[in-house]
Amino acid sequence: MEESVASEGLEFKWGKKKGVGGKKKDVQFYESFTYDGDEYRLYDCVLVGNASEPDSTEPFIGMIIKIWEHANKHIPKKVKLLWFFKPSEIAPYLEGVPNVLANEVFLASGEGLGLANTNQLEAIGGKCSVLCISKDKRNPQPSDEKFNSADFVFCRAFDVGSCKVVDTIDDKIAGVDVKFIFNRACSEKEATAVQNIEADVNGKSDSLKPNGPLARGASGSVRKIEDSAFESSDCKENSNGCKEEKEKGHYQLAIKKSTLAEERSNKDSGSRGNHYNGKDQESEVKKQLTKQKSMPGEERYSNSFEASGSRTIHSISKKAQENDVKKQLTKQKSMPAGERYSQESSGLDDRPLKKQKLDGSVTVRDGWDTTILQNITSDGKKDTGSFKRPRDKVTIEEVPPEKRSFVKNRDLVVSVSEGKTTKTVTEKGISKKPSFGRAEDKMSADDNERNYQVTEVCRRPDAGKSKWFRSLPWEESMREAEKKGTVVLLQNLDPTYTSDEVEDIVYSALNQQCEARMIERTSVTIPHIGEALVIFKTREVAERVIRRLDEGCLLLSSGRPLVASFAKITPPGKPSLFSGHIKLHKTQTRREMRDAVATSHSSQPNNLEFDMAMEWCLHQARHEQASESVSKRQLEEMKSLRINFKLKLP
């Protein structure tokens, strides 16, 4: 059974399952997978970008010898690669090695660093063909056509333990039988010519180099290569099997590999435009494939990276244009309102507006009169009338509205009316990028250029419908929503709003269903500012609403902006029985008495108090001895004075 998943915006799909491993049987092995439109199987040769040198055009070459996924989604999908060495990577050890071809590589063998290691699946950048031209009797000899079309060839191995080039290849390398490393037998089923041509056009079987890791570094995501995070009897990997260049905390790039047809879009767009049917298209593709295969390997690589480099320059120029547009929008925001409207009105007067086909007004139950304020022709065509600023109008109904989509530099006025009361909300620049959904990504250019919109707020479609099941109490709903992260706190509301009106404003202005509850005012709250708690269905919707209100500005009728943030609810604690007193529970007292450790109330030699007491006693003894010696000396001096003293009579 195949399993489809999404990996960073690229198409990914598992292929045939192979077996289950791990101590807990939580590791699933696979024989193949499809990544970014290319199918990868066991023992296919792939290219892996070198993140330590982003500008380098020399990726690493490896053979897939194991594919697996852990049941824990936090652990990424893994592949084990058996490495090939290019002559430039082992140049110091090639002295005395004869007849080294230009596109020759050396198979890693032996035991030690550089044999094989575990990588993330997203580090693979593309497929390549590595052909074995060894005269070993175990190796099926390739044809001249395969030899000419191969990207790389190998006939010798490099022993990573002794760092020597050997001519013999072992029966098993990194636990893989050598028959899977040699060329496939001719008796195996091969794809037809048309299938091979289609695979070549789609960039599956003959795509030489990925366009991502070397020419489009900005589109790739950097992945640090680590050994297997889990060890089991079936999936234990040799964590020391890494290249010397890759072992020291290196990175590899998971890239978006473009197809071969995209590489040659600038070159062959004219010729391919006339071949869409039948044999003409097939013959044209065959010519292009034969021409490409006849080129040397180095030239094909250089052409591939030149094409990808041109796309990089084009993307850089496109980003520069976007930066210029952002600067102009920032400059326009800093201008006074009157001057900005005066400059915009000249360009807006001649611009046609997209209108919705709607007749008159729609009356909703419970006395809500909902009117969509738009000028609509009977045949549904666009009205090319001039756009007039709302400030020049007496009533709101005369302002031409548009679709409910939020674009930068656009004012949205929402009127909530029930009976005779009317409340207005204005939204400016809700979003810098209309990328919150696929529908919003497909907005037309007219939607991106409109600067003002007025719409009448109506009740939600399901506001008056009866419900079969009773809803949960508000407290339970709040607790469940807080666990999911879908509770949003709206501030700066009008305190006179009701919960239903807040829900209607969110539905009309932000086009989202929610459940709202106004927070009751107390003696410590500000009487002029209201707050409401809003529960959305999912966390993504809540984040989208907060992002819109944060990047843009939703103004109320009083001119105050509406502020939204995630709410953290703290339930009130249990009040004490006596105000100002803390009561100790009997259970806590009993627990403390039970867990108390018997201790002595006097000083013991094993504590700090004993040492301090001994030091104090020493100082006290010294003081007493000094005082006693001073007293004795004083008495002796007094006795001597009395003896020598003679009373003088008058």
UniProtKB/Swiss-Prot annotation:
Result of knocking out the encoding gene: Developmental defects, dwarf phenotype and short siliques. DNA hypermethylation at genic regions. Impeded use of distal polyadenylation sites at intronic heterochromatin (HC)-containing genes (e.g. histone demethylase gene IBM1) resulting in a lack of functional full-length transcripts. Abolished expression of At4g16870, a transposable element (TE) of Copia-like retrotransposon origin, associated with methylated status.
Annotated organism of origin: Arabidopsis thaliana
Chain intervals with Basic and acidic residues compositional bias: 259-270, 277-287, 348-358, 438-448
UniProt keyword list: Chromatin regulator, RNA-binding, Transcription, Transcription regulation
Keyword Transcription: yes
Gene Ontology terms: biological process: epigenetic regulation of gene expression; gene silencing by siRNA-directed DNA methylation; transposable element silencing by heterochromatin formation
Region (Disordered): 202-223, 229-248, 257-359, 425-448
Start and end residues of each RRM domain: 486-569
Matching InterPro entries: BAH_dom (IPR001025), BAH_sf (IPR043151), Nucleotide-bd_a/b_plait_sf (IPR012677), RBD_domain_sf (IPR035979), RRM_dom (IPR000504)
Subunit: Component of the ASI1-AIPP1-EDM2 (AAE) RNA regulatory complex composed of at least AIPP1/EDM3, ASI1 and EDM2 and may contain CPL2, AIPP2 and AIPP3/BDT1. Binds directly to AIPP1/EDM3 and AIPP2.
Gene Ontology molecular function: chromatin binding; RNA binding
Gene this chain is encoded by: ASI1
Lineage: Eukaryota, Viridiplantae, Streptophyta, Embryophyta, Tracheophyta
BAH domain span: 38-169
Polar residues bias spans: 302-315
Function of the molecule: Collaboratively with AIPP1/EDM3 and EDM2, the AAE complex regulates alternative RNA processing (e.g. alternative splicing) and epigenetic silencing (e.g. H3K9me2) of intronic heterochromatin-containing genes as well as genic heterochromatin-containing genes by promoting distal 3' polyadenylation; may associate with intronic heterochromatin and bind gene transcripts to modulate polyadenylation. Required to prevent promoter DNA hypermethylation and transcriptional silencing of some transgenes.
Protein's name in the database: Protein ANTI-SILENCING 1
GO CC term (a single one): protein-containing complex
